[in-house]
Design a protein with these regions (language model features):
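Helicase motor core with emphasis on the C-terminal RecA-like subdomain
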Residues: 5-18, 22-26, 30-52, 60-62, ...
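Short, charged low-complexity linear segments at domain edges
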Residues: 367-397
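Accessory DNA-binding and partner-docking regions appended to nucleic-acid-acting proteins
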Residues: 2-11, 345-346, 357-362, 371-373, ...
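Flexible coil/turn residues that form the inter-helical turn or adjacent wing/linker of helix-turn-helix
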Residues: 172, 234, 386, 437, ...
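Short helix-to-turn junction characteristic of helix-turn-helix DNA-binding domains
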Residues: 35, 230, 281, 383, ...
């Protein structure tokens, strides 16, 4: 009993002194406690929920070394910088280091100088690393971005399977912990199974980010839509994601031409330019960045007020993770997806023309392809549903709030008219029957609209009994009905690029009138009431102090060559503005300020606060 009390005190002490927090966030303490008890853990926690503390804190209390497997070099470097700034000795092993640097880092770890070692999965089976782990005292192996180990995941990497062999090779099995931000039930089960987690403690903290507003728009001109949005949010920092480098360059040039302080990021730029552009964004020199999805992993910029998607992403997992880079400070932020049917075609092309991965077997390649197509289908449904957008995504991840109206998405803030479209749905079903389930949405839509196209005539659909039965209806309306039928399970699509429409067991219930298909149709949109987004609880003077502290943070970050959030987070700056600390003890009561952070930076921030208050007195 005394040992448990002592561990609890030590745990709280590390949380306070190293990480600067008085209390754990949702799910963190349970995960930490189970790891310290020697139990395997699987944590599913959304972006910004504090996953890293869940393994970094127990790593400092366990007797040996913790190995953290991470897929991205930039992510490792930032994590190690943040730990070093907090007074924790950590290292990383990846291709950014020379062989001599790797040898030195592993030697130092073996000598007990590092408690945490980050490693790229490709390094796990190198002779040097194997020699190290077989002779070192390994207390825990942590797998970050654990969805990469699952064939059901959106980013399956065969190199992650090397982790399984590594665990088996160790003379003593360590605690194994796995973390990811986005995982469906199938992916979660696969993570547990493939890693061979022993009776794991599984914690899903919930995917909902209530401060994020979600919206899907289908503009006639995406460029004009983006420009108007950015111009009306000039004071805000934002990310604009595009599916291709070509679109990144086009949108970037358009915004720059119109006087926006904007930068860009994609794999076609050289390393130096990517690094410089990323720093311009992080330091708010250029608060807007246009990027492919190569950008953002591990970027902890808390004041991003909006994420626009110029193109629809390939899957809900990617969309939720990318959109989740907005509002990490807990303040209101907007996530807006600009959809066009062309986005589906672009993504199908990208899926069909993925570069060959020699690590994949033929069976794995087919499984990944089929899963990609299935996920793309779910993403497309998101863009057409009239139901709550937040609830749609939560349901996708296996979470159900039971709410019909979240009050913070475009569908829930819209006024809809309900229409019974059972008759149209019945015509669709009869047409699919008549063609013996051989065609997809475009052909079925063209058939019942009676379109006079040579391609349709070549299929012989002009002889169908249903040809032209919905001639008066628009193409978009019929496609909307078909999407609704797919969503409600009255139809299904094949999992390939042709997306052939197939009937289900419930299809005939619409023809018989046993069930009805009710579709929401947008009548008019209410203007979304945008809140003035300023740090919580700050008055005009508090905002002036916040800006002074923010500028001080940027200067320090540049001098130290670290991202600003590593110095202090926006939340910490806001807390300083509220509490106005004057002494070390008072500064240590600020959320996010630990002993090591205080010793490095605290005095400069205390001085800045004092100068601000003295100016207040003079002008008072």
């Amino acid at each position: 009993m005394a040992g448990m009390v002592d561990m609890k005190n030590r745990k709280k002490d590390v949380l306070r002194k190293v990480f600067g927090y008085d209390s754990f966030r949702t799910g963190q303490e349970e995960i930490v406690d189970n790891i310290l008890l020697g139990r395997d853990v699987c944590g599913i926690m959304p972006t910004g929920a504090g996953k890293s503390i869940c393994y970094q804190l127990p790593a400092l209390l366990l007797p040996g070394i913790t190995i953290v497997v991470s897929p991205l070099i930039s992510l490792m470097i930032d994590q190690v910088k943040a730990l070093n700034e907090a007074g924790v000795h950590a290292a990383y092993i990846n291709s950014a280091l020379t062989e001599n640097q790797i040898t030195k880092a592993l030697y130092n770890a073996m000598c007990g100088r590092y408690k945490i070692v980050y490693v790229a999965p490709e390094r796990l089976e190198t002779n040097r690393f194997l020699e190290f782990v077989l002779n070192a005292d390994i207390s825990m192996i942590t797998i970050d971005e654990a969805h990469c180990i699952s064939q059901w995941g959106q980013d399956f990497r065969p190199s992650y399977l090397k982790i399984v062999n590594l665990i088996k090779m160790l003379p003593k099995r360590p605690v194994v912990s796995a973390f990811t931000a986005t995982a469906t039930q199938a992916v979660k089960d696969d993570i547990v199974c493939v890693l061979g987690l022993n009776n794991p403690f599984i914690k899903v903290t919930g995917f909902d980010r209530s401060n994020l507003y979600f919206e899907v728009r289908q503009p006639n001109n995406k460029d004009a839509e983006v420009l108007n949005y950015v111009l009306s949010h000039r004071d805000d920092s934002g990310i604009i994601y595009c599916a291709t480098r070509k679109n990144v360059d086009k949108v970037y040039a358009m915004l720059a031409k119109n006087g926006i302080a904007v930068t860009r990021y994609h794999a076609g730029l050289d390393n130096d330019m990517r690094k410089a552009n990323q720093e311009d964004f992080i330091y708010d020199e250029k608060p807007v960045i246009v990027a492919t999805n190569a950008f953002g992993m591990g970027i902890d910029k808390s004041n991003v007020r909006y994420v626009l998607h110029y193109n629809m992403p390939q899957c809900i997992e990617n969309y939720y993770q990318e959109a989740g880079r907005a509002g990490r400070d807990g303040e209101p932020a907007e996530c807006i997806l600009l959809f066009s049917p062309q986005d589906v075609i672009i993504n199908e092309f990208l899926i069909e023309n993925k570069g060959e991965n020699n690590e994949f077997t033929e069976e794995e390649r087919k499984a990944v392809h089929d899963n990609d197509i299935r996920r793309l289908k779910k993403m497309r449904y998101y863009c057409s549903t009239k139901e709550c957008l937040r609830e749609y995504m939560l349901n996708y991840f296996g979470e159900y709030s039971g709410k019909d109206d979240c009050g913070n998405c475009s569908n829930c803030s819209a006024v809809f008219e309900e229409k019974d479209v059972t008759n149209t749905a019945s015509v669709v079903i009869k047409t699919i029957k008549e063609c013996h389930e051989r065609f997809g949405t475009l052909v079925i839509t063209g058939t019942i609209r009676g379109e006079n196209k040579a391609k349709l005539r070549s299929y012989g659909v002009d002889r169908y009994s249903t040809f032209g039965m919905c001639r008066q209806m628009s193409e978009s309306f019929i496609k909307g009905v078909i999407d609704k039928m797919l969503l409600d399970g009255y139809l299904r699509e094949t999992d390939d690029m042709y997306r052939i429409l197939k009937l289900t067991e419930t299809s005939d219930m619409l023809i018989s009138g046993e069930e009805h298909l009710i579709m929401k149709w947008s009548e008019r949109k209410e203007e979304f009431k945008k809140e003035k987004r300023t740090p919580k609880s700050l008055d005009a003077d508090g905002l002036m102090l916040f800006e002074r502290l923010r500028m001080l943070r940027i200067d320090i970050a540049r001098n130290e060559n670290v991202p600003p959030y590593i110095v202090f987070s926006d939340k910490a700056l806001t807390d300083m503005c509220i509490k106005r600390p004057h002494t070390k003890a008072e500064m240590l009561n600020v959320n996010g300020v630990g002993e090591n952070k205080y010793e490095r930076y605290g005095k400069e921030f205390l001085k800045c606060i004092k100068e601000h208050e003295n100016q207040e007195d003079i002008h008072g």
